[in-house]
């Protein structure tokens, strides 16, 4: 994970403000935990962190602001034209050292069942953001390679550049990483690397209710939880 953070901050394709989009196969895969943990980790390193959220949902940006103290903006291609989205993104992120964009639902899930319009994929394409795919790897091995292959090849130019494995032990991670990168190389996607993992740890469990209104005591607990997640990552 340390190498992933270093690469993100040295992305030559985005000289002024490096950033990436965190997406997943589906909801409840660990996107929010990963996004919040990484924001916390970068802040602890003294970086100026900026956040975005795909879609019109206001709850996650509110969570980014209230719990992490990170300015956050919605990136919505359903209500906004592409040019307006690009302009808003550049204005929002211009003073940041790193920008983390949190996806919505699954990577290709848009505003309707049969369209990618407004999806995380759509936003990544529009802004030219590299994508890190968060995958719940608990109870899986070789099948993970098949899942990645299917998602990467479902549409052209997916922009997926990294895989973040969720719910993986420190002991198993090196073996899963080696297997996945070998398989990805074999099927012609050697540019995609496994960039890190999140262990099975309570600090990465953010219940849905935590993303709404919380009491002052819950706020303190959440801030401490996210701080610990950042230290682990």
Predicted regions and their residues:
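ATP-dependent carboxylate-amine ligase catalytic core
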Residues: 5, 11-33, 39-127, 135-162, ...
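Internal gly/pro-rich beta-alpha loop/helix module
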Residues: 142-233
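Short hydrophobic alpha-helical runs that function as membrane-insertion/retention elements
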Residues: 131-134, 195-196
């Amino acid at each position: 994970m340390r190498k992933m953070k270093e690469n993100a901050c040295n992305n030559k394709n985005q000289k002024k403000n490096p950033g990436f989009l965190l997406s997943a196969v589906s909801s409840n895969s660990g996107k929010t935990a990963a996004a919040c943990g990484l924001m916390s980790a970068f802040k602890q390193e003294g970086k100026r962190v900026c956040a975005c959220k795909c879609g019109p949902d206001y709850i996650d940006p509110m969570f980014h602001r209230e719990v992490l103290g990170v300015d956050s903006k919605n990136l919505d291609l359903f209500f906004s034209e592409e040019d307006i989205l690009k302009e808003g993104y550049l204005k929002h992120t211009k003073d940041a050292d790193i920008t983390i964009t949190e996806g919505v639902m699954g990577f290709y899930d848009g505003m309707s069942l049969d369209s990618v319009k407004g999806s995380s994929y759509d936003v990544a394409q529009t802004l030219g953001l590299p994508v890190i795919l968060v995958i719940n790897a608990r109870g899986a091995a070789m099948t993970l390679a098949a899942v990645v292959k299917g998602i990467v090849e479902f549409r052209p130019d997916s922009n997926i550049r990294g895989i973040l494995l969720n719910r993986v032990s420190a002991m198993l991670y090196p073996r899963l990483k080696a297997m996945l990168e070998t398989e990805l190389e074999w099927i012609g996607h050697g540019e995609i690397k496994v960039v890190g993992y999140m262990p099975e740890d309570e600090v990465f469990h953010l219940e849905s209710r935590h993303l709404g209104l919380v009491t002052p005591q819950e706020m303190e607990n959440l801030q401490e939880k996210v701080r610990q997640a950042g230290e682990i990552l």
